[in-house]
Amino acid sequence: MTKSYMPLFRSPRQFKKIYFILIPLILAVIILHVFFDGFNKISEYSPTFISNRILNHQDQQQKSEKSSDVISSYFPSLAIYPKNFDNRVEFVNEPKNSKWIQYFGDSKTVLSNYITNQTYTNHSIGLYSSSTVRPPASSCKDILYERSFEITKYRTLHDDLYKLATTLLYQLENDPAFQDLSPFFNDRLPHIIMRGELHKHIYKFAGTSVWLEQHGVHLMLSRVIYSQQGKKNDPQLSLLYAQVYDENWNELNDIELIVPVINPNGERVYDSVKYPQFLAIPFYHNSEYIKSRWYGPEDTRLILTKNKFGDDEPVIIFNSYHRQIKDMSTEDDNNVHTKFEFYRSMFVGWLFQYQLGKLNTDGIQDSKFNNVTFNKVKELRIEGKERTSIEKNWTPFIDPDERNQISYYGNHNLGDNYVYIVYQWNHLKILKCELDNFIDSSHSTCTMFFKDVETTQEVGPVRGGTELWPIKIDNNNNNNNLNEDDLSTKQEPQQQRQLWIGFLRAHVKDCGCGGSMYRPNFLILEKLNSKFKLTYLSGSINFNVSVYGWANYDVVCAGHEANALIPNGISMFDQDDDYLTLSMSVADQDNTLVHIHGVKKLIYSLDHDWNGILKENKQIECVVNNANDFCKAYADEHYKLGDSEAAIKEVKQKAKEEAEKAKAEKEKAEKEKAEKEKAEKEKEEKEKEEKEEKEKAEKEKEEKEKAEKELAEKELAEQKDEDAKDEDKNEDEDDKEKNDESGLTEKSEVEENGENTNEGGEDDGDGDGEEEKEDDDDIEV
């Protein structure tokens, strides 16, 4: 059964009304697209790219419900061609995404309305000068300049750990450069993903980025560490994760950049590179030995250079654990025995240049990597110096005065041939390292280009930090401040002074907050002829960023942990409008951005009158003192807020003491109650016993009295009986005596009257017998 047809417009009038709305809307979108959108379809750039695929895409766009929303239609799957795309260059891997566009925006695109329209607040900093023109400073206050710039509220970039983990899992299974890393994960990664425990094993931080002007995007590299045991301070593997962001710092997922790369043969070709992805940085590793070994690139700094073809070349400076051959010997069994030494050394790497194998990191070439493509890296070796066990915290920068104009088709090698590196900030030491035309192809040779004074002092607490960004200012040094002793070093006036700005990190230990503290320090480095000077260095800056605990998010200044806010890179610096974006990390666990307005204004507000003379100064000492004071103040503040370990311990101790006190009081009360109850019970029992005893005694008394009474009565009765008996006896005796007396009388009478008695014997005898019988009866009774 078919449905009846229902027309879209029921009348021509409705059709016209719709057109009156649609036509202006479409025209407005086209105008906005042309004037404000830096992206255009690649088919509009070159007719050679008009293909069935592009036409199909355009056909689909015409049918799409979002055909008027041109910008959003580019995403999520997209391939971006550079605005200087050269179709004469060979293409090795064409993009897999169905949507192709080319970027035509200008260099100002990096400063978007998103950045300029944010709310900025004043932020004060103190800078310590190393000026030798001013009178010798007796205290830190004498060289302190109070200045300020404006900052936005910090923004923490979202970490999609699921996307990161699935990308890693795909590369472990499919990318030859990563397959050998699989044993580190022991097939646990899928289970970790399923259980939702990625945050326990994977940490992403130390993000640093560059703006790719030819593509109109930020390319950010972050360090990703993996811990088998789920402990952030005990990782086994460190990798580099590359992501692409637009000018508003929105991540562009599953995007391809068409970039000019230099293949292992040294040829310039176009390649399609998909992001996000983990970079195939070669490094030595052994999954069977993981104790006290952290494999992979660390402390990566990203800097944009120009290669010999004139292309923007993202270059990384990092340190990595590697091995090198120390000794090789042949034993009696004719087997070659190799002894290795292990180092943590500095390397330079190229994001768009490649190599086969990893001989330069493993010490020997393993045949299984012979045909595996890695990013090109070279160890940075200081000329005339043996390798040390650990090298780290180098600060890179490019000198634009040495950057020549590029002429690729003229076959000129005129790119950035060198990168400068600040090797040490206290007693300044600067290296100059090769980026091309290597003296020794196995490494990049670094020469000690400048050193303040000869010293064996180790790297101090001020170190590392971001890459340095060049800036030129008008010269205000007229040499009027030179004294007679300095005439021999008098310099000719320059039209402009070459400066570099950046952010170091002061690392102070045992300062009152946990084990140590890291905070950014703004710096200004100056070059005069071939001499360098750290002219200004600020005290610790917090940028109003909340620094949470290293292990426990809610507890700061804990144990031996670091309280860390570390500057990673300058993402952009628009000098015309004076905006700068700084990337930082908190507690080695995230990437945070702060936009700054007024850095250039701050620089121009300072004196720049260095005449090339180098003298001792208190600058570094003052900065370190400031860092220690900052640390103590921070610890005191968070002690008052109650989220420091000391405050929490005190609260817990007080709570424990109060609990113990309450327990003791409770026990005391219970004891007193028990004792009272016991006493009352004992009293009751005693009273009861006394009562019972009393009653018993009374009863016994009564019974005794009764018995005594009865006994007395009995005795009385008996006495009475006895008395009666005695009385009777006495009476009987009296009677007897009487009788005896009567008898004697009678006898005498008889004797006297013997004859009378004998004559009347029967009658008298009978009578006398009856009287005796009666007497006997009376006695018996």
UniProtKB/Swiss-Prot annotation:
It holds the Pfam family BMT. Residues 640-733 form a coiled coil. Its main location: membrane. The chain crosses the membrane at residues 18-38. Keywords: Cell wall biogenesis/degradation, Coiled coil, Glycosyltransferase, Membrane, Signal-anchor, Transferase, Transmembrane, Transmembrane helix. Residues 1-17 are cytoplasmic. Induction: Expression in regulated by TSA1 and repressed in rat catheter biofilm. One of its GO terms (biological process) is cell wall organization. It is found in: Membrane. Residues 663-728, 736-750 have a biased composition (Basic and acidic residues). Residues 663-781 are annotated as: Disordered. One of its GO terms (cellular component) is membrane. Disruption phenotype: Impairs the elongation of beta-mannose chains on the acid-labile fraction of cell wall phosphopeptidomannan. One of its GO terms (molecular function) is mannosyltransferase activity. Its EC number is 2.4.1.-. It is a single-pass type II membrane protein. Residues 751-781 have a biased composition (Acidic residues). InterPro entries: BMT1. Belongs to the BMT family. Beta-mannosyltransferase involved in cell wall biosynthesis. Required for the elongation of beta-mannose chains on the acid-labile fraction of cell wall phosphopeptidomannan. This is Beta-mannosyltransferase 4. It comes from Candida albicans (strain SC5314 / ATCC MYA-2876). The gene is BMT4.
